[in-house]
Amino acid sequence: MANHIYLAGDSTVQTYGDSTNQGGWGQFLGSHLPEHIQVINRAIGGRSSKTFVEEGRLQAILDVIEPDDWLFVQMGHNDASKNKPERYTEPYTTYKQYLKQYIAGAREKGAHPLLITPVARFHYENGVFLNDFPDYCIAMKQTAAEENVQLIDLMEKSLAFFTEKGEEKVYTYFMISEGINDYTHFTKKGANEMAKLVAKGIKELGLPLTESIIKER
């Protein structure tokens, strides 16, 4: 049975300290899982599927990941940065190619890869929250199907959750509520809500992470 979940991701996933109210869902995921599951959060801001590999961050995970561990991958926000070519990947070519490196690397170590679509931003029209990364979500789903990999559609889950809660409530989930011109990053409150959605996705997939006792918080 898996005891570790390694997280590869960006600033919406990474762990932040107590000096800021900013949070990433990766720092809260463990509190919604059985106590024997250890979440090791290697997500870091500003990285795309490409730069996370190029900087050796994927390899650093693969050096320590063990058989039957899990590698959760949420990438896409920074992949979409056309104005930053060092980060940018094209959804249906290079993005998919890089995702497949994570998948192959995990499997070579006897671990289980899982893909997570990019989480939604604070962007809505007429009360409905919008997907800012549609091509990356489609490309990730294609990759999951092609490689027979489990996927949690966090974009879909977060959009539905935000639309249900409404703009005023969701406003408090994002750093824009802290007086910062930031429609992407979460407050700790918002990050914890996203962690709940990921935990729900784990349960829905019936993953061998003792889903029957995932905490309902």
Curated annotation (Swiss-Prot):
Induction description: Up-regulated by growth on type I rhamnogalacturonan.
Pfam families the record matches: Lipase_GDSL
GO MF entries: hydrolase activity, acting on ester bonds
Gene3D superfamilies: SGNH hydrolase (3.40.50.1110)
Keywords in alphabetical order: Hydrolase
EC numbers on record: 3.1.1.-
Domain of life: Bacteria
CDD domains with a match to the protein in the record: Rhamnogalacturan_acetylesterase_like
Broad enzyme group: hydrolase
Entry annotation: catalytic residues: S11 (nucleophile), E178, H185
Function: May play a role in the degradation of rhamnogalacturonan derived from plant cell walls. Probably has broad substrate specificity and may degrade several types of acetylated substrates.
Xref: PANTHER family: PUTATIVE (AFU_ORTHOLOGUE AFUA_2G17250)-RELATED, RHAMNOGALACTURONAN ACETYLESTERASE
Family indicated by similarity: Belongs to the 'GDSL' lipolytic enzyme family.
Protein name, as recorded: Probable rhamnogalacturonan acetylesterase YesY
Gene field: yesY
